[in-house]
Amino acid sequence: NTEFAELKIRDKIFKLPILKASIGQDVIDISKVYSEADCFTYDPGFMSTASCRSTITYIDGDQGILRHRGYDIKDLAEKSDFLEVAYLLIYGELPNNKQYNDFTKKVAHHALVNERLHYLFQTFCSSSHPMAIMLAAVGSLSAFYPDLLNFFKEADYELTAIRMIAKIPTIAAMSYKYSIGQPFVYPDNSLDFTENFLHMMFATPCEKYKVNPVIKNALNKIFILHADHEQNASTSTVRIAGSSGANPFACVSTGIASLWGPAHGGANEAVINMLKEIGSVENIPKYIAKAKDKNDNFRLMGFGHRVYKNYDPRAAVLKETCKEVLKELGQLDNNPLLQIAIELEAIALKDEYFIERKLYPNVDFYSGIIYKAMGIPPQMFTVLFATARTVGWMAQWKEMHEDPEQKISRPR
């Protein structure tokens, strides 16, 4: 039996259906408010608005819960690899051995990009930001793969998702190599997804890169933790672009552009800069006071989240992962950024100012320290975020095209 909410406008009462969620909050259907009541709803930033039906990711920000297709993010980070999670997001279930092997082979098969794409990279200045290069390169893929400009059946959606998941890491590594003046390194299909990415990032034609298993496992976890996160800014951008029928390469390029914003994907670089500014553990109280001062421009980066009003479950995984990486590299006891971060977190979590405002460490707080220890420069942080989030973008894009209720997005 359908329940209704009542909306009174002037002297007339309108009944709005209450849609039952499979988990989480119920939703009031306002889709007919304009046609029946001649009014629009106003919700800046979509703070209370659900834009679609989705079964991919669930977040309970009050409890600090993140699940993909019903699986807890901590379990996935500890027990799965990135392509298993990619399969889960796209198809709705974890793969069996045959499905996993077939999927990984398809991804490896499509990792190579058209050789002519190399010429596009040469048009950029050597000082160009890798995100700028990546944005242009991904958008240009529609010129190299015109067979996916028109898609009509499920097989097209699957091929598109696989191609995108396969080629984005190659383009990400190429963007880095070009920015530092090194030759491109081709994908190696004998390596798994994460190993191959590290190989393309750090190998050179004259020197092979030996993948440290601790580094590989850490990057695998980072990719899993960044794979999808409901209808965030970049995912919503991909869905809105996709609602017009735009080709998937164009859609993902819009997601990359949105992710590049400092309030979205650039926060972990800001955390590193903040920790450097603080400089030492002794300076933390001074900067805590600055963060509380509304007249001071200093902001405590890596704390707080639009959705989470509890400890971000991804941050908890990354805190331990950070310690594992630094221990492997012999930096656990002498890394100044980690020492500042741990002490800053400890002080903030006991401070009433932060407790009252529910400001807890988020996923960006420790990820930058891990990247830096791996030898990944700050300008590449958001590129790696995009590499992981491509999986979520494609799962959401595929779900949108398979949803009969979806229309072209047109806010008023």
From Swiss-Prot:
Keywords annotated in UniProt: Transferase, Tricarboxylic acid cycle
InterPro entries cross-referenced by the UniProt entry: Citrate_synth-like_lrg_a-sub, Citrate_synth-like_sm_a-sub, Citrate_synthase, Citrate_synthase_AS, Citrate_synthase_bac-typ, Citrate_synthase_sf, Citrate_synthase_typ-I
Signal peptide: none
Entry superkingdom: Bacteria
EC number(s) reported in the record: 2.3.3.16
Any GO MF annotation of the entry: citrate (Si)-synthase activity
Catalytic activity of the protein: oxaloacetate + acetyl-CoA + H2O = citrate + CoA + H(+)
UniProt-listed GO biological process terms: tricarboxylic acid cycle
Active-site feature positions: H305, D364
Matching CDD domains: EcCS_like (cd06114)
Pathway the protein acts in: Carbohydrate metabolism; tricarboxylic acid cycle; isocitrate from oxaloacetate: step 1/2
Record-linked PROSITE patterns: CITRATE_SYNTHASE
GO CC, alphabetical: cytoplasm
Family assignment from sequence similarity: Belongs to the citrate synthase family.
Any further remark recorded for this protein: Citrate synthase is found in nearly all cells capable of oxidative metabolism.
Name used for this protein in its record: Citrate synthase
Gene that produces this protein: gltA
